[in-house]
Amino acid sequence: MKKNITKTIIASTVIAAGLLTQTNDAKAFFSYEGKGLEIAKNLADQAKKDDERIDKLMKESDKNQTPYKAETVNDLYLIVKKLSQGDVKKAVVRIKDGGPRDYYTFDLTRPLEENRKNIKVVKNGEIDSIYWD
């Protein structure tokens, strides 16, 4: 009788250890999956905010019949991306009265680099022209 109880206790311990290992692996997997979903949600929220902001800027310019204005390079990039049609890979934006630094070049096949997003646009930020490539 003691042998059966000992075997049962050992078997239960082995099974419990296996279940514990599996649940820890599952917790680790689901925690990474949860973080991935959270990051994706944050990116989607940020894209939605950017889109709403650009829509507001463009509607305001259309209403006042003035050239599009941008405060940062990120705004320029989003305006150009929204105005692009077809298979456009590059765009060069010229700012009105910007002097020697009045051109901004964007690769539309990739997202804008983080270090360029918050750079202020020269002068008042009015777009003079956009060249598509």
UniProtKB/Swiss-Prot annotation:
Domain of life of the organism encoding this protein: Bacteria
Keyword field contains Secreted: yes
Gene3D superfamilies: Chemotaxis-inhibiting protein CHIPS
InterPro entries (alphabetical): FLIPR, FLIPR/CHIP_sf, FLIPR/CHIPS
UniProt cross-references to Pfam families, sorted A to Z: FPRL1_inhibitor
Annotated keywords: Secreted, Signal, Virulence
Compartment(s) of residence: Secreted
Ranges that cross the membrane: none
Signal sequence interval, chain numbering: 1-28
Secreted among keywords: yes
GO terms under cellular component: extracellular region
Main location group: secreted
Family of this protein: Belongs to the CHIPS/FLIPr family.
NCBIfam families: PRK13033.1
Function, in words: May be involved in countering the first line of host defense mechanisms. Impairs the leukocyte response to FPRL1 agonists by binding directly to host FPRL1.
Name the UniProt record assigns to this protein: FPRL1 inhibitory protein
